[in-house]
Curated annotation (Swiss-Prot):
The modification N6-(pyridoxal phosphate)lysine is found at K41. This is Putative cysteine synthase. It comes from the Bacteria. The lineage of its organism: Bacteria, Pseudomonadati, Pseudomonadota, Alphaproteobacteria, Hyphomicrobiales. PROSITE patterns: CYS_SYNTHASE.
Length: 336
């Protein structure tokens, strides 16, 4: 098929299996980093823009404003190009530099929030405030507000339909990251509609407040809800069977491990989801076909989580994680 716009390339991403010997389980990765903007957020960005244009909230030639750590912003930049819109991304120091460079390359205007923030502090509240202000003040502008936008979870309908077609023997469990809650809600609701017995496990960073734990700073980007922010209205707790936390070290060391053992560069949040999926499989809590998404690629984090000096300076290295992963995947520890 010959495509004529870049957003037509969104979806139909491949799947890759990782066998877990002796556990009656296979971990399946949905390679969402293969979307044109490099992440699964392309799906919901397109969904939100189309919905806003159709219901008149966003006029032709208008301006999209959104608070983003980068992936949603990249997806919105692509959609803005296709539909002839202006896009302003409101970011903070926590966003990966390469994500900001990518948004700029696609024509997005970047606005930084001002403030004295710790390096591991996510300034979501300040980003949301500035984005809402710009959306209200600029003529023809709309603050997309992905955390409360129903078109966010609706954007993942196609992902589940693809999985059902790709895995005809069925899906037994889904392990996904939770940030705004859009992908976790959209995927989990549709999976359970197809099969109510599917187990759904939501993973947030240690320090995130989605499941009521005390909040503190964390380095994982584009996932979780930091202290001081409110959990998004799109998150449907009713479709989630269990919420768990993963540390920065567990998430980042797993991403590095997958790169070196499987040749697949995944982002830090994906590393966290893979770690928890394997932990649950190793403990016998999940069996059968267990799916998670490669939400974005590690190519955006080569200067951070894949950089030895960056990791060491922040005391995030722990070779015991690789040994633990070897134990789950090979039944024994190997040299990291």
């Amino acid at each position: 098929m010959l495509h004529t716009t870049v957003t037509q390339l969104i979806g139909q991403t491949p799947v890759m299996s990782i066998d877990v010997p002796g556990r009656n389980a296979t971990l399946v990765l949905k390679i969402e980093k293969n979307n044109p903007g490099g992440s699964m957020k392309d799906r919901m960005a397109r969904s939100m823009v189309i919905a806003a244009l159709q219901d008149g909230r966003l006029p032709p030639g208008g301006t999209i404003v959104e608070s983003s750590s980068g992936n949603t912003g990249t997806g919105l930049a692509l959609a803005a190009l296709e539909f002839g819109l202006r896009f302003i991304a409101v970011v903070d120091h926590h966003a990966a530099p390469d994500k900001i460079r990518m948004m700029r390359a696609l024509g997005a205007e970047i606005r930084y929030v001002e403030g004295d923030f710790r390096e591991d502090e996510v300034a979501v509240v300040e980003r949301q405030r500035l984005a809402a202000q710009l959306g209200a003040q600029l003529p023809g502008a709309l603050f997309m507000n992905q955390s409360d936008n129903p078109a966010n979870p609706e954007g993942y309908t196609g992902l589940v339909d693809e999985l059902v077609a790709q895995l005809p023997d069925g899906i037994d469990a889904f392990v996904g990251c939770v940030g705004t809650g859009g992908s976790m809600t959209g995927i989990s609701q549709r999976l359970k509609r197809n099969n109510p017995a599917v187990r759904t496990i939501a993973v947030e960073p240690a320090g995130s407040i989605v499941f009521g734990k005390p909040g503190h700073p964390y380095y994982q980007s584009g996932t979780g809800t930091p202290a001081g922010d409110e959990v998004g209205k799109v998150l449907d707790y009713g479709c989630i069977d269990e919420g768990v936390q993963v540390t920065d070290t567990q998430a980042f060391e797993t991403a590095r491990y997958i790169a070196r053992r499987k040749g697949l560069l995944v982002g830090g949040s994906t590393g966290g989801a893979i770690y928890k999926a394997l932990e649950f499989i190793g403990a016998g809590k999940l069996t059968g076909t267990v799916v998670t998404t490669v939400a974005d690629g590690g190519e955006k984090y080569l200067g951070t989580i894949f950089d030895e000096e960056w990791m060491a300076k922040r005391r995030l290295l722990d070779p015991a994680i690789a040994a633990q992963l070897d134990g789950w995947l090979f039944g024994k520890a190997r040299a990291a």
